[in-house]
From Swiss-Prot:
Sequence positions that bind K(+): 34, 36, 66
Pathway(s) annotated for this protein in UniProt: Carbohydrate degradation; glycolysis; pyruvate from D-glyceraldehyde 3-phosphate: step 5/5
Sites where the protein binds substrate: 32, 242-243, 275
Binding site for ATP: 34-37, 73
Domain of life: Bacteria
Site (Transition state stabilizer): 217
Subunit structure: Homotetramer.
Family note: Belongs to the pyruvate kinase family.
GO terms of molecular function: ATP binding; kinase activity; magnesium ion binding; potassium ion binding; pyruvate kinase activity
Reaction equation(s) it catalyzes: pyruvate + ATP = phosphoenolpyruvate + ADP + H(+)
Alphabetized InterPro entries for the sequence: Pyr_Knase, Pyrv/PenolPyrv_kinase-like_dom, Pyrv_kinase-like_dom_sf, Pyrv_Knase-like_insert_dom_sf, Pyrv_Knase_brl, Pyrv_Knase_C, Pyrv_Knase_C_sf, Pyrv_Knase_insert_dom_sf
Protein name, UniProt field: Pyruvate kinase
EC top class named in words: transferase
Length: 466
């Protein structure tokens, strides 16, 4: 049984009913809807297909809507591409024009005010480096430090400046409306720079009468400066290594990844690692050795889930990529005992109980850890310790059942709601037996809250299945 969860992007290659069904059968836990592409109707159809199939198959499969955010891009060119040469002058303008080798438009009107002489501007995922030498009301004049080819609508990064961009765009608001309409499990927020961005997203969601978890994508230098504050107000974190590797020196990405995961785990927030997980499999049927090693190291770092993007959205081998990721994850998990997280807030009762639950389950060689839960928080806290046993999260809440599909080691089980906790546990144990997860004579460690309120994990019990 694989503990690490797999998140896959649904795109042109995989948005058919048949392909989504095959992906669920291969063990995909969360489907990502990328709102950088496609319209409302197109994305709604994906959601409806996933919901229909997960109900049909009785699988805890979640849906994550990834909000595109305020991505800064260059405009269209007169030709397919232009080549910039080192030392030449190149201008960025806020006017809408067709660009050439001397000038190109950008979609951020405040850019000339936001940057200053000496700032670095990166184009095309950092492949082209510009240095600001002069600004006017509508233009930013630069000198090319590292040249290369640019095509239409390339990404623009300015790691040294605090840009005046809205954290949520009008397009994002439309897709928040779509997600709340269909009660998706998660929203991912792009280009988070400060905790206020996350709080603003949550407020937008509440305008539609819903409370849906927000996963903050850490992909800017500004986010790293306020990382702990962002983690505290987020419901999960995504290490978005693509833009992050442009905003900071690329050699720092591995260390920063470890730091983000470690801090997220301290605060018991699920973590997704994304970008170029199996990049070579977009074209090739087999991964590189480096990709396989990267997957294992992300799991050793403590990642709850790994995200495939173009590999499943447009790649030639989407199903093979899922199979490879699953196989590598299972193999890496055999050695997780050497990479255990033990840091926690010792002043927090729920955290201390969860830590003790891990220790007790190891000492007794228990078959399972069972966490009756309303919100899912107990299961998330226990999972961060890389426990050897599966964590069965018994919940009467359908939304929690689906959301826990993102959390490593957790097996969500939808259990019948009961007025008495003991009755709920007894029925849950019976269901666990029926699923083949435990049998008579097995020891299970159970941790829950009394009197069953959200966020009050304060009890541990050891039960024998009979």
């Amino acid at each position: 049984m694989r503990s690490t969860k797999i998140v896959c992007t649904v795109g042109p290659r995989t948005d058919s009913y048949e392909m989504i069904e095959k992906m669920i059968d291969l063990g995909v836990n969360v489907f990502r809807i990328n709102t950088s592409h496609g319209d409302w109707n197109e994305q709604e159809q994906k959601i409806l297909k996933i919901k229909d199939l997960r109900e049909k198959k009785k699988k805890p499969v979640a849906i994550l809507i990834d909000l595109a955010g305020p991505k800064i891009r260059t405009g269209y060119l007169e030709k397919e591409f232009v080549e910039l040469k080192e030392g030449q002058i190149f201008t960025l303008t806020t006017k809408e024009i067709l660009g050439n080798e001397h000038i190109v438009s950008v979609n951020l009107s405040s850019l000339p005010k936001d940057v200053k002489k000496g700032d670095t501007i990166l184009l095309s995922d950092g492949e082209i480096v510009l240095e600001v030498i002069e600004t006017t009301d509508t233009e930013v004049k630069t000198v090319v430090k590292v040249g290369g080819k640019i095509t239409h609508r390339r990404g623009v990064n300015v790691p040294t400046a605090d840009l005046s961009v809205e954290s949520i765009t009008d397009r994002d608001r439309e897709f928040i409306k779509l997600g709340t309409l269909h009660d998706v499990e998660f929203f991912a927020l792009s280009f988070v720079r400060k905790p206020e961005d996350v709080l603003k997203a949550k407020e937008e969601i509440r305008k539609h009468g819903k409370e849906i978890p927000v996963i903050s994508k850490i992909e800017t230098k500004k986010a790293l400066e306020r990382l702990e504050e962002i983690i505290k107000v987020s419901d999960g974190i995504m290490v978005a290594r693509g833009d992050l590797g442009v905003e900071i020196p690329i050699e720092e990405v591995p260390i920063v990844q470890k730091e983000i995961i470690k801090l997220s785990k301290y605060y018991s927030k699920p973590v997704i690692v994304a970008t170029q997980i199996l990049e070579s499999m977009i074209e090739n049927p087999f991964p590189t050795r480096a990709e396989v090693t990267d997957i294992a190291n992300a799991i050793f770092d403590g990642a709850d889930a790994l995200l495939l993007t173009a590999e499943t959205a447009v790649g030639k081998h989407p199903l093979e990529a899922i199979k490879v990721l699953s196989k590598v994850a299972k193999e890496a998990e055999k050695k997780l005992e050497f990479f255990r997280t033990i840091e926690y807030d010792t002043s927090d009762i729920s955290e201390a109980i969860s830590h003790a639950c891990w220790q007790l389950s190891e000492s007794l060689n228990a078959k399972l850890i069972i966490t009756p839960t309303i919100s899912g928080s107990t299961a998330v806290r226990v999972s961060k310790y890389n426990v050897s046993q599966p964590i069965v999260a018994l919940t009467p809440e359908e939304k929690t059942y689906y959301r826990l599909s993102l959390v490593r080691k957790v097996i969500p089980v939808l259990a019948e709601k009961c007025s008495q906790e003991l009755e709920f546990i007894e029925k849950g144990l019976k269901k666990v037996e029926e699923m083949g997860l435990a049998e008579k004579g097995d020891l299970v460690v159970l941790t829950s809250g009394v009197p069953g309120k959200v966020g009050t994990t304060n009890t541990i019990r050891v039960l024998k299945v009979d």
